[in-house]
Amino acid sequence: MSMKKLLENFNKHLSESSLSRTHQHLMEHDCAIITGYRGDPTDSSKCVADRRKDVGNDALKINKERNAELISNLRSLGYGVTSVAGSYVEDFMQDTAKEVKEASLFVANLNDDPSFLAQIENLGQYFCQDSVLLIPQGGQGAYLLGTNNSEFPGLGQKIDVGSFAGGEEAEFMTRVKGRPFVFKEK
């Protein structure tokens, strides 16, 4: 077997085991998907929380700094954090809607902290996210929770997105090590 083929097989196995590990976390703990990224990280017009003002004209650099700060906050709370690739429509159903691909974070409540969902909601507000994806233990009944003043889903509003479906692609999806997963109605 060539080295290239060996590496391809290893990477495929790594991708599958990473998706399996994600599924295992979903079965055993409450989980969430969140990011510090914003389409325009300097625009705080829809924010509800007091947060340091992001300044500058390099959005990618600002977003990377925001995600690093978010990772630090999540780890300090004792949560498991895995980098994933997210894809969704920011400002959904508005004139300013646009597809955004961003570095997102899959967060597992490894210590079953009873304040996990509230902590994720607070971090969503702090980082001025339109919403966070909250996933109850078992991977069923996941929902978006609005965490800023965007029209969709709206501050404090819940939008049911369904249950975990590994290996499937959709308009709104997440990838871990290149393997997609979605939440959808069954």
List the predicted regions and their residue ranges:
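N-terminal, charge-rich interaction modules
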Residues: 5-83, 87, 182-186
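Active-site-proximal loop/helix of nucleotide/amide-processing enzymes and allied scaffolds
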Residues: 20, 33-34, 114-117, 151
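Short, surface-exposed beta-edge/turn micro-motifs
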Residues: 28-31, 101-105, 128-131
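Short, intrinsically disordered low-complexity segments
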Residues: 69-111
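A generic structural motif
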Residues: 82-86, 131-138
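Short, compact, well-ordered microdomains
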Residues: 114-136
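Short proline/glycine- and acidic-rich turn/helix-capping motifs at secondary-structure junctions
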Residues: 135-149
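A recognition module on extended beta-rich or small alphabeta surfaces enriched in W/G with H and D/E
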Residues: 153-186
